[in-house]
Amino acid sequence: MLVSTESISLNYLKYSETSVILKCFTKSDGLKSYLLKGVRSTKKKSLNIGLFQPLTILEIDANHKNKGNLESIRSAKISKAFKTIHLDIYKNTIVLFLSEVLSKSIKEEEKNTRLFEFIKESLIWLDQSSNFSNFHIHFLVKLLNYLGISPEKTNLNLGGFNMLEGVFCIYDQSEYCINGRLVDNFKLFLGTDFDANLSEINSLNKRKELIEFLIKYMQIHLPEFNRPKSLNVLYELFK
């Protein structure tokens, strides 16, 4: 079936000398993998490998057989051109990190318009913003909701957080229970927008602490999720 849809590229793997396997999150059908034959060849004119950089928002015409095999793309073009993301090393590094997180966390091969629009609008916000130091933390916290693993937002007055149950609680020193500054800082991100002025989160250590917590939380609740390799690059750049 020929489908025309918006799509967000997640990553691609080299396949043979001239081809790649591209993973995309499509607006029409959720997660899809495509075999792009000859796309790395200098002779290939219809599709350019440069179109498929991580988290590029595309408009594609694709053949979807929906049999669990690799699909094919007939044509692709930029749907929303970024002005700053690919030119700003800090934004670009954040995008590489988030593309890896999304690749590891999105597994559903079905339509999820809410998740698609969240990712798209988040990227547009990042591209237009000059104050994005906490963007990736906001993104991860919001992503939990779309993945169905967002923590309960009741009992916010309690000082502990049980990572296994995803609830705020009285701190009890059990394996999955945390408290202190980390819990207080996590609460700041619940229900806030990207442009929230969180002056308390003003150092690399605080951001790193929150990111490590969120990654661990995702590992607990998403069995196949493992630590993104791009984290170390992110930390190195922002230190």
Write out the residue ranges for each language-model feature.
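Non-catalytic alpha-helical scaffolds and adjoining flexible linkers that form interface surfaces
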Residues: 1-20, 25-239
